[in-house]
Amino acid sequence: MSSITLPAKANEHPQVRTLNILRDLSPVADLIELCFSPTMDQDGQRYLSDMRRASHDDKFLSWANHMAESTSLPLTGYVWEENNKIVGNASLIPFRDQGKRIYLIANVATHPDHRRRGIGRILTQRAMEHARSKKATAIWLHVRDDNPGAIKLYADLGFQEIARRTNWQANPDLSFPKPATDIEINLRHPRFWAQQLDWLRRLYPDNLSWYQPLNINALKPGLINWLYRLFMDFNIKQWAAVSKRDGENLLATLTWMPQGGRTEAIYAATRSLVLPKESRDDVSGAEALTQLLIHVRRALANHPTLSLDYPAGEMTDAILAAGFKPRRTLIWMRA
């Protein structure tokens, strides 16, 4: 894919400067809220609250000033400032992937009164230059699929789409109706581990493992892993959907692995993911996923909102049938 080289030297764009966490966190939070509040969820609101709270925490600011390049927090980046007001931002978040440095560009925002001037483009390129100067092996970003302007901008800068994933959410509900079915839901048996592992690796691929919180190894059955989860207070629940006629016929699995926060993550894997494209929504796999999602909504009735990350366009009807609603679809792009 072609890449457009844009001038981004400090003397050509004097409005651009590096993020100063000692004074910029609150105005950047205000800018992000202004630009993204219509699509912001509770986690996003909490993120902004944390930024504003951190901006008044001297101990945190002192620590963060020395850790900006080694922590997965948005403590590095570039802003566009005019008349002592921040009107543009691009954050840089460092990650490690198998020992290699990568960066996620996030929070690319331009004040509505200053758009169509190329500010977002220039800030994104400056962020890319920073990442390359740090010997990053990859630069990532994600963008909503309903933002064609931003998608084109990033494509013009050399980013290519790697994945497209939808986040689904539903509140636990003990009263949610459970339809009659020939599918049985049980705790996941160790004999299903090999099949579950294969499905999970296909559904949660390695190229996004640096960002996804799923620790697949923690799901492995056995005494050692059980002791690890016990001593680390690592709470996990796993279920399997099988045919009542043949209990050895695994149809789907579902894992609940809360990470803290206002939503709790669940991870689904179904047989359909390994079938040809034209057969992916097979009846048994789709019905099994629906039954598992209904089961977890009923079983975790006193828990926070459940959140499912799933490939966009896959099993849509099955997930909707369980009462989940799509929150957003993100396109993951890499340069």
Where are these regions (language model features)?
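Conserved acetyl-CoA-binding loop-helix of GNAT-fold acetyltransferases
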Residues: 107-110, 116-129, 133, 138, ...
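Conserved beta-strand-loop-alpha-helix junction that forms the acyl-donor binding cleft
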Residues: 111, 141-150, 168-172, 306-317
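Active-site rim helix/loop that mediates acceptor-substrate recognition in acyltransferases
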Residues: 36-82, 86, 210-238
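Conserved N-terminal entry element of GNAT/NAT acetyltransferase domains
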Residues: 1-34, 38, 171-191
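Conserved active-site alpha-helix within GNAT-family acetyltransferase domains
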Residues: 121, 145-163, 311-328
